[in-house]
């Protein structure tokens, strides 16, 4: 393949990489962000999304990079989520009077890394993408350098992230040692030929370490320890970003590695994913019961929801991966909207971040209270909100798989949803029935608008959106397994 053909396939990453460098130089002279600077960053992400949609499909650089329907689907969602994060972050910085230009640059660099992982066709490109996004996210977690909790969050994330990278690299080195290649297609060929020999066992041993490293990135139990502390300490706009785009990118990593590199080892890795899925669901459900801080509560909610997405990956095949992609897309909208609403709220200039702070919110800010209620019911899986359809697809895929383990996992997942209902309903009860805790400041218009838009998507827009989201996710799921 010629250089021009390779270049056309990686154009979205090129656009974002060049834009990040230009914005970095621009910011160095300007010293702070501005509406024009923020607009340029958002435009770069939208341009990359368009390039991903209209660009050609194929494999670049001898199979190291895959531009297919799955990558396109994930990149569009990731880039749009990143653009929203930049807009919300710009408003957060403006309120604090500390308009650092690095915020937008870091989000773009994280988006580049996520895009690379979504298109990875090789263990090396996978690792490069993972580390590029992780390094940017470490800095974003500690972006409030004058805040002890933010600095602590960034440090914890960095230290545990280094551990997970070590696990991932160790697994990758074992796989390379037994397969003799880092390309997913070559690993799949070796795995198929040596499924019952020493090489097959060695590959599976490496895969276990690789899954452990990836589980950290997606906050799956038992590698979830960093999530509540990082969510609590990081800025609200950053938390909304953390809970959305990186989660989809991490799920794409799971789908790429398992679907493209280990398609003949489904029986082995399915058991591991089912255990991780159920552990995540029940850790998220039960640990969330004791939380009063909303960021920590939604951290455990995200752990539980990762469990449901992993159930879709464990189901495998086009149906399972289709359910995972739809689940993550709908979940991204809900979690972005919830944290946008949370960012919009303050009392006496201080953020409202606990359930007690939300007491009587419907009397002070009825619109935001209704939106947050919608997001809570959606995360719970209550019909007709988008979260119901997300879980409907995942549980439907598991129950229709014909695998008894997956069917029991789906039943237990429903039990976990019932347990988690308590903390969602506790928040709703505080907003609607408790006495107001005091006057609420005028909300941030941009954050409020994002929250309202996401709430409208959750219902009723989702009913129309699924008409084109469903076939798009199905086409994306069909692309896996063709490394």
UniProtKB/Swiss-Prot annotation:
What subcellular locations does the record give?
Answer: Cell inner membrane
Q: Does the keyword Ubl conjugation feature in the UniProt annotation? A: no
One GO molecular-function entry: NADH:ubiquinone reductase (non-electrogenic) activity
Any Pfam family matching the protein: Proton_antipo_M
Q: What GO cellular-component annotations does this UniProt entry give?
A: plasma membrane
Q: Which GO terms describe its biological process?
A: ATP synthesis coupled electron transport
E.C. code: 7.1.1.-
- What name goes with this protein? NADH-quinone oxidoreductase subunit N
């Amino acid at each position: 393949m010629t250089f021009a053909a390779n270049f056309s396939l990686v154009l979205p990453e090129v656009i974002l990489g060049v834009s990040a460098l230009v914005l970095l130089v621009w910011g160095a002279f300007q010293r702070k962000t501005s509406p024009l600077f923020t607009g340029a960053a958002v435009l770069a992400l939208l341009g990359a999304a368009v390039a991903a949609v209209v660009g050609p499909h194929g494999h670049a650089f001898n199979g190291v990079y895959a531009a297919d329907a799955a990558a396109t689907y994930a990149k569009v969602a990731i880039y749009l989520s990143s653009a929203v994060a930049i807009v919300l972050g710009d408003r957060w910085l403006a309120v604090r009077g500390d308009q650092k230009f690095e915020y937008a640059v870091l989000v773009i660099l994280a988006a580049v890394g996520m895009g690379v992982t979504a298109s990875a066709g090789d263990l090396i490109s996978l690792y490069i993408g993972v580390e590029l996004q992780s390094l940017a996210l470490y800095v974003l977690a500690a972006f409030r350098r004058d805040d002890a909790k933010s600095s602590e969050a960034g440090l914890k994330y960095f230290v545990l992230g280094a551990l997970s990278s070590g696990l991932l690299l160790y697994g990758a080195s074992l796989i390379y040692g037994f397969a003799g290649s880092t390309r997913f297609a070559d690993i799949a060929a070796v795995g198929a030929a040596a499924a019952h020999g020493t090489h097959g066992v060695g590959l599976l041993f490496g895969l276990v370490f690789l899954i452990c490293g990836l589980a950290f990135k997606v906050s799956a139990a038992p590698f979830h320890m960093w999530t509540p502390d990082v969510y609590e300490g990081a800025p609200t706009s950053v938390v909304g970003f953390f809970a959305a785009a990186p989660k989809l990118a991490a799920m794409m990593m799971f789908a790429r590695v398992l679907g493209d590199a280990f398609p003949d080892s489904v029986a082995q890795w399915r058991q591991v994913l089912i255990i991780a899925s159920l552990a995540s669901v029940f850790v998220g459900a039960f640990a969330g019961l004791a939380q009063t801080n909303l960021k920590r509560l939604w951290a455990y909610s995200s752990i539980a929801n990762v469990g449901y997405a992993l159930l879709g990956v464990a189901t495998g095949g086009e149906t399972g991966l289709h359910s995972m992609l739809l689940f993550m897309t709908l979940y991204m909208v809900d979690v972005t909207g919830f944290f946008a609403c949370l960012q919009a709220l303050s009392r006496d200039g201080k953020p409202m971040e606990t359930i007690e702070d939300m007491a009587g919110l419907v009397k002070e800010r009825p619109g935001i209270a209704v939106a947050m209620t919608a997001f809570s019911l959606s995360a719970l899986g209550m019909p007709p909100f988008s979260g119901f359809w997300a879980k409907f697809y995942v549980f439907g895929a598991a129950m229709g798989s014909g695998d008894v383990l997956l069917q029991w996992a789906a039943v237990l997942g429903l039990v976990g949803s019932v347990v988690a209902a308590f903390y969602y309903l506790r928040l709703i009860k505080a907003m609607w029935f408790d006495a107001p805790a005091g006057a609420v400041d005028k909300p941030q218009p941009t954050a409020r608008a994002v929250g309202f838009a996401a709430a409208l998507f959750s219902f009723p827009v989702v009913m129309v959106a699924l008409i084109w989201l469903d076939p798009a996710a199905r086409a994306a799921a069909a692309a896996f397994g063709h490394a």
